[in-house]
Amino acid sequence: RADYKVIPLINIGDTGEIKYKYAPKYIETFPHSIGWMLLRDYNCDGKKDVFYSASGGVMSVSKNISSIKLAFDLIDNKVSSDQYPGGDIGIYIPSADIPAIGYVDHDGDIDIITFGVLGTSLEYHRNYGMENHGTCDSLDYTLKNYCWGHFSEVGINTNKLVLKDTCNYNVPIPEGTTGGSGSSRHVGSTVTMFDNNGDSVMDLLLGDVTFDNVVMGLNGGTAPNTNSAMVSV
């Protein structure tokens, strides 16, 4: 990441075996000069598309158009979200951060969870592709919570989390409860969401460039977009 280069690794292992081989021939296929990159199938065609950081902290998406050869086509160089009260604004993600991109509400379109620009809490950008267009191939985002997970990071000297925190500022009727303070933090945080126990609400793994451990947050909610407060770490 320090050199903003893509390092392709192909799994050449047998079934059940993980064995990677460096494959430099694919380097030119991927976007250049990026801070982070995640492969996600946003349009449900079975091919992994590319979500990545572009210049200025905005997020871009390139669609996988491969047939015989691996190929991508830029479809959105500035993914935006309807953000209260500012309207449609590009989703800002520092190049040193890595957001979580996946299915928060399990409706088939890709959602985004990422740390806010200045805060220690997580923003939840919900994709309304299925609701508004009836298909998963739309990137139709709305900021539904400035403080998803009902927690905040303590500050720059520790990666501990404060649970049941109170959000100083949020969208009207936020989804997934409220939480998180507005204090500043350093960049270099990674967010991974996954369902640890199969209850359909997302738990979290949080990493930080300053610390050598990963913090796990367990979601005590029972339904996506209704109650998603972290109850233990």
Regions of interest found by a model, annotated:
Residues 1-233:
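Beta-propeller-forming repeat regions
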